[in-house]
Amino acid sequence: MQHFLPDSESAFEEHPWNWHTPLESKALIIGTFPSALKNRKYNFFYPNPANFFWRIMSEVSDIPLLHFNGEKAVEERKEILSKLKLAVTDIGKTIVRYNGSSLDEKLEVQEFMDIFKILEENSTIEKIIFTSSSGKSSAVSWFLRYLTEKGIHHRFPKGNKPIRSEFIFNERKILLAILYSPSPRAANRITFEKLVEIYRNEILF
């Protein structure tokens, strides 16, 4: 849903899917917010074919990608997540998007997704994996702001990715991992094969 603001260059958007949590999910992938509607090929997470996310998940799960638009693409990707016991969401629940852009830096978060509710409803989740960490409009930056709103102050260690940390939620230790972004703009820093290896190690822990 979009509500255009007085500035015609910006639009208010609500997340169209909230989250998807297969039975007995072990890890939760958190991104920022879906790409602009014009770049979506189907109604599910990472709907922009330019993003490498589903290519990586296909390699990790050994399930080939055969469908790239419509409901069959959605069902195929849900099958991948079920096999990997991998939940997925975005940290932004409502945002303002500027200039119709899909770039994270053109997004301004208004309300965060209820990550704690996801953890409460899915007691098997042991790890949160972040797909972006650069700049103020990233999954990691927004997650840290979300934690602060919940009275938890957390800092990640510095170093090369994957960057690992943890926090305690309702007496549960939740592992945290910051990975390289699967976006094509970030992919020039690392080979696709290395991306697959890193994601595989963090998902199949």
Language-model features: where?
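C-terminal capping/extension of enzyme domains
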Residues: 1-18, 23-24, 37-40, 47-49, ...
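N-terminal nucleotide-binding beta1-loop-alpha1 segment
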Residues: 29-32
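Short amphipathic alpha-helices and their capping/turn segments at secondary-structure boundaries
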Residues: 15-21, 72-82, 119
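Structural motif
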Residues: 26-27, 127
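Internal catalytic-core helix/loop-beta-alpha segment
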Residues: 83-146
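Residue-level signal for well-ordered alpha-helical scaffold segments within enzymatic catalytic domains
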Residues: 55-59, 117, 181
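Short, surface-exposed acidic-centric catalytic microdomains
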Residues: 38-107
